[in-house]
Structures are given as structure tokens and as C-alpha cells.
Amino acid sequence: MFNNKIDKNIRDLLNLISSSRFNTYLVGGCVRDIILGYTPKDLDVLVEDDIDEFSIFLSRSLNSKIIKFQNHGFETFRIINTKTKLNIDITKYSNGNDGFLNDLSMRDFTINSMAISLNDGKFDFNDIVDPFHGLEDLNNNLIRYVSKDSVLFDPLRLLRSVRLSSKLNFNIEENTKKYFMINSEKINIVSNERIRDEIIDIFALNNSSKALILMEELNILNQIFPEIQLTNGINQGGLHDKDVYMHSLATLYFI
């Protein structure tokens, strides 16, 4: 069922990876997007073998360059495929199956913690590695944290939940929402640059006003934009039927 939704360029790329001798998995948001019928802009690949050797193999096969960087302390190789405009991020996992499952356990949300094996010359989106029941949450339109530790590992995930909820029209699961509300101040330890990038992506959504309302519910809005929060309850008088805050949201809705 899911295999029929895959873009041809991505299918060719996955065939290339799965036909190699390396033990690899496709993981994260790209798995979610393909299941939902979207074409992902980025692919995340986990490799058990020599990450340098696999990255060289893939970059040469695609005639693309490699960028090496640290992502939350993990060595990551990024290959930019100029043909498909895809970013391919490659990360190594260790200690066999335990290391692989540990990687999935540190991902942000259950819908992003699914994986597909790219081994033995084949891949099958109907055979999903899903230890945290992400597919069930995907079918129920829910965003749920994998664990409390996974949220605190990178508090930007508080804001990312808002973007995903608004983008996919999903609800944030109640226990997850309560935990986010309690820990909303953790967003302040994230760099301004990363928050800025996430906010830009939120404002690019068609329903960014809904995202701001959700940010308020999660107590994130007053952490990032205290000036906006202060307009809540300020009457404008005259012919206005909304306070300054709701008027601003209505304006954003029509932009």
C-alpha cells in the first residue's frame, strides 16, 4: 500500500542504498511523510557499518559532495543530491539492534520514530519498524512524545510540535501537551538562531495564526514573544470587536 506512494527519484535512491553491502535504515520524518503520501525534502539514514565508507559510496554514486558536521554530539554526514534536491543525512548507530532501538528512542515524536530496513536489495514500507506505535498515532492524527527524556534532549521539540500540529492538522496528545506546558521555559535554553528558523517555518504555514494560539496554550508564546502575549485583553474601542491580541491573529490569518 505505502510503496505505491513513493516518488520515483526517492525510490531509485532507496534501491541504490538497499542494494549496497551496508546495513542501513531509513528513519524519522521522511518515513512519516512517505506514509502520508508526501514527498520528503530530506532523508535520514542510519548506518551500522563504517559511516565514512558508506558516505563515500553514496556521494560517488550520486556524484554529490559530502558535508560533515556534529548534530547534538553525533557525527553526521550530509549529502546534497543536486539531481533530486534532496538532503541525505547519514548517522551511525552502534551495538547492533540495541543501538538502533536506542536511536529511535531518542527521537522527538512517535510519528518520527519509525524506520524501514534498507537491506538485502529491497525495502518495504508495509514492513515498518515501529517500537513506539508511531503508525497508530499517525492514523489517529496524534503527536506524542517518545519519552520525557527525548523532549529534554532538545527543547526545540516543544516548538516543533506546534509546527507539526499545524502543518499536519494533528492534535498534541494530552499527556504530551501537559508535559510541554510544565516545561515551556526550557525553550529558553535553545539558541536564538534555531528558534528563529523554526518560527520562520511556522509563519510560512497557511494556518500560522492557529499555530500561535497553540503556542499560547503550551505557554511557549510568552517565552518567545512576551510582547504579543501582553496584548491579550487590551481593548481597542470603537468599532473593533476583538482585543489587540485576537485582532493580530485575525490579521495574520488573512495575510
Where are these regions (language model features)?
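Catalytic cores of the polymerase beta-like nucleotidyltransferase superfamily
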Residues: 1-255
